[in-house]
Amino acid sequence: MPAILDVRGREVLDSRGNPTVEAEVYLEDGSVGRAIVPSGASTGSREALELRDNDPKRYKGKGVLQAVKNINEIIAQELIGLEALDQYTVDKTMIELDGTENKSRLGANAILAVSLATARAAAASLGVPLYLYLGGVQARELPTPLMNVINGGKHADNPLDFQEYMIVPLASTFKESLRWAVEVFHTLKSILKSKGLNTNVGDEGGFAPYLEKNEDPLAILVEAIQKAGFEPGKDVALALDLAASEFYENGKYILKAEGKELTSDEMISFLEYLCDKYPIVSIEDGLSEKDWDGWKKLTDKLGKRVQLVGDDIFVTNPKILAEGIEKGIANAILVKVNQIGSLTETLDTIRIAHQAGYRTVISHRSGETEDTFIADLSVAVNSGQIKTGSLSRTDRIAKYNQLLRIEEELGEAALYRGILNFKR
């Protein structure tokens, strides 16, 4: 098995123009793997720590030179000589070297960049695609995309409290679903223009029009789906990411768009109303990460009819997910590799979720890069769903293009389950 010859880190930029970490892993047989880590805007309080320099003279304090230095001077020395195909040992070595619960010494961004680059180097050494290296011959399911086409909350400068309004194309193949979504996206742009609304795009490639009520985007999306020639719910469904932790204060949900302060029960009733009125198949972070009792009620109320995805509440952490499963919280988990900070721990979380019957949604972050690792990961683990932004901005499109390549490569072996991924 090829051993690690060298590990190098560098500071590069993400899609928001902020510094992030890139790592390269060199093997003795000449193989090389490279990976760049993303960064989030709305983050769970228990996420692994993204190490920043906090030097106001560089990048307004957002530099990552310390994380890069940790790769070049600390991590590299420990990994040289280890077998690249032994991902568990590589990751375990870095985690133990860090020695903290949230990877705050070396930085989750440093550890993750090396972890993902190691997997890429190993795949290159074997001469196989990344998805096949990670998942073996069972890796053949293309994910149904949840595409963020209207932004609110922290992702936009408008009155909307909810962070993401998504379309979910349900064709018979990934390629066809992508086409359907593109046609809805461009129709949506035309509708927004006709209403005199802003069609500039945000961090994730979605529109951020000035809409006054949290329900308004859902009505416009239904209109766009119909005008594009599709049937809402049958051809193209809807999904929400509320990022509710962002508007949860003192036990209440502060909906500024509606001018209301809701209790957990009232918030659940509002979500039930939206599900009754619109073809919603998935709700992410419908309640705050601090409102576990509310989450239990939400799951009991809506869990048999819609997918309830835990992001901030689980932060891709296998221990927290196991606790949530035991308590009957949610029925799906959003998987963000940089929330936990290593490939091994990410795969552990996915395994625990699937064993418990929870769905997994592989996800990007709002600060992305050209790296397409999550596209391969979604196929490798047969997650069945991916969230990687809208139908604009190269940092988002790169993932969709990679999935098109994978579907073509798999040929007749490729699976695309569409709406079946959301059936309760």
Swiss-Prot record:
Binds a second Mg(2+) ion via substrate during catalysis. Belongs to the enolase family. This is Enolase. It catalyses: (2R)-2-phosphoglycerate = phosphoenolpyruvate + H2O. Pathway: Carbohydrate degradation; glycolysis; pyruvate from D-glyceraldehyde 3-phosphate: step 4/5. It comes from the Bacteria. Disulfide bonds: none annotated. Keywords: Cytoplasm, Glycolysis, Lyase, Magnesium, Metal-binding, Secreted. Its main location: cytoplasm. It comes from Dictyoglomus thermophilum (strain ATCC 35947 / DSM 3960 / H-6-12). The keyword Transferase does not apply. Its cofactor is Mg(2+). SMART domains: Enolase_C, Enolase_N.
